[in-house]
Amino acid sequence: MVSFAFVFTSPTKRQRVRGAAMDDGGHVQAMREGFHINWMNMRDASTGQVMWESGEWDCDQEEMEAQIPCEILRCRQVSRELNFSSVEVITSLRLVQSVIFKGELLEEWNFHFGFVIPNSTNTWQQTIEAAEEEEMLPAELLSGNVVIETTFFDGEYPIMTQRVRIWYL
């Protein structure tokens, strides 16, 4: 299982990220303070129908909850749009999304955005392909037991981690 522990410390301290030491300079701290998720939605990628959306993101909250219609589990592909703002330049924005079921890592995906202009607001769309129907767990079993952990990076430097517990309706 992949776990991330982030301690936001002064620029003179060092921290470990996935086993590699890194210098936590002032720019990294400024990136963390200036990065914000504005809104997100998820659509059925084949029809474009919005299945879920939220404009309320508290990036400082340890874990959020989302109520998502169970019909989303029937979509072959889900398109996720994420709108974010950054005060600082980010040279290589990427995210790692981990799907955690009852404390165990089920899946992990990596997405790469690239360069982010300072003082900009951007919309990033990703398409996520569903597992085969016979491999899917039922909504009743998943609901409340799945946490989506998304960690944003500039290259190897962590910017922010957001955890969302999923409840299927």
Task: Walk through the language-model features, giving the residues of each.
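N-terminal onset of structured domains
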Residues: V2-I117, E133-E135, A139-L169
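Short strand-edge motifs at loop-to-beta-strand transitions and within beta-strands
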Residues: S120-I128
